[in-house]
A protein has these predicted regions:
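Rossmann-like dinucleotide-binding cores of NAD(P)H-dependent redox enzymes
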Residues: 1-29, 112-115, 132-133, 138-158
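Short glycine-enriched, charge-decorated loop/helix-capping segments at active-site entrances
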Residues: 4, 106-111, 206-207
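General small-molecule cofactor/ligand-binding pocket signal
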Residues: 19-21, 91, 168-170
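Short loop/edge segments at beta-strand edges and connector loops
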Residues: 22-24, 73, 171
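FAD-site-proximal beta/loop scaffold in flavoenzymes
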Residues: 35, 45-125, 217
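Short strand-coil-strand connectors
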Residues: 40-44, 86, 146
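Flexible, glycine-rich terminal cap/loop adjacent to redox cofactors
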Residues: 148-150, 163-257
Length: 257
């Protein structure tokens, strides 16, 4: 996600007494009888109570390899828009294939259950003789971090750089409810948009459950190739127990230049 949100998440962890160790060149696991007893972090020994392996995902392509199917450089099963593999009688979907990123128009890999579900319908229909095709995908991922939620939509600034897309970004914080309400708290949002045509490229949010809705709105606007200016023109609902008087998205839209 965006660097500003990474800093905020680190502060959340610190407040809860959780120590974060990152960016080590040499990380060694010291094991005994198959159990991790300690971790060597560039010479510093830490004895954890619990170890969780969260090193990312790779496609499970064992069956595809045995079937002789063509794979991509990422190790995913290569498919066309009908989800047909290199064997015309075999279709693939889910976490073992790549998708076409709506923003970059390039192949990408992010195993998301909602995308897998949608693609499964297409693969099943075509395996039965149909002619359906899949669409490009907007990355729209939410995770819970302690008492907050983080949402990433589209591409980040770093991904825009990697894909040579000229971009600008704006950010703001605003209360999720009017300040007199007991559940009012700050929500952070950042929009990445094309430097020339102002179309929305991506966004990131950190706050309460409301950020899920923000993410879905941005995802739809990316699909519609909408300018970031439209965020200031939308009509947002308002009622004190549920929604803010001035929506964070509206504030962000007014900052677009």
């Amino acid at each position: 996600t965006e660097p500003e949100i990474r800093v905020m998440i680190l502060e959340l962890l610190k407040k809860e007494g959780i120590i974060f160790h990152g960016a080590y060149d040499n990380l060694l696991l010291n094991t005994e009888n198959g159990f991790i007893k300690s971790i060597n972090l560039d010479g510093r020994i830490i004895e954890p109570e619990l170890v969780i392996s969260a090193v990312g995902f790779t496609p499970n392509n064992i069956l595809a390899e045995k079937a002789g199917l063509r794979l991509t450089p990422r190790g995913a099963v290569k498919v066309d828009r009908s989800l047909k593999t290199s064997d015309p009688s075999i279709f693939a979907c889910g976490d073992n294939i790549e998708i076409i990123n709506e923003v970059t128009k390039r192949t990408d890999y992010f195993p998301v259950a909602t995308v897998a579900h949608d693609f499964a319908h297409v693969a099943g229909e075509n395996a039965a003789g149909g002619s359906a095709v899949v669409n490009t995908v907007v990355k729209n991922i939410a995770v819970k971090i302690l008492n907050k939620f983080q949402v990433s939509v589209g591409i980040t600034e770093a991904e825009a750089l990697q894909n040579s897309i000229p971009f600008k970004s704006i950010q703001a914080s605003a209360p999720n409810l009017v300040k007199v309400m007991p559940d009012s708290r700050q929500v952070f949002g950042k929009i990445v948009y094309h430097a020339l045509n102002k179309n929305i490229l991506g966004a990131a949010f950190l706050g309460g459950k409301e950020v899920s809705g923000y993410g879905d709105i941005i995802s739809a606007l990316i699909k519609l190739k909408s300018s970031a200016h439209i965020l200031a023109d939308l009509n947002y609902n308002y009622t004190p127990p549920l929604s803010p008087f001035i929506n964070l998205l509206s504030i962000l839209g007014r900052k677009v230049k």
